[in-house]
Amino acid sequence: RFPNGMGNDSGELGHNLMDHHFQTGAYGTFDGFKNKTTYGRKPAGFFIPRFRNIGGITNRKDFIRGYGYQGGASRGSKSIANSKEELAAYGKRFKEIIVQDGEWSGSMGAFGEILPYHDNRMTLDYDKLDKWGLPTVTFNATIRENEIAMRKDMKEQAIEMLERSGFK
């Protein structure tokens, strides 16, 4: 009754694997607010909903669909590796260094989906079994021209937004 596996009468089970972009965006530091710090809870993050390919001037010819961003800002501790003296510090000097405030920084991570290409798929590998004797999962997927163009725009737009906000 199930020559292609249970629930796979159409032969589509495992095909059209989709994922989301990963590690695309930008990071920068901010020179202002040196007299400000945070105590307890940190500054809230932000969310920028999809703004590409929603009509008019937002439309792109090099990729379809759109993407958004999530991000935030924070002020870290001063790095203890700014000099050999600081790197070798211990005791009182070490404590003095690590309690100093570092730079304000901000980051934007892009998110958008990868298109459902038919040959992006997962399969069961009956030749490679797990410790319980069950087949392992094999993924075979790649990004294409649409995703490459989208990733390029994700990075460019994140950099532009951070720079216009005063980040370096």
Tell what function each PLM region has:
Residues F30-T37, A44-K168:
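FAD-dependent oxidoreductase catalytic-site/capping-region signature
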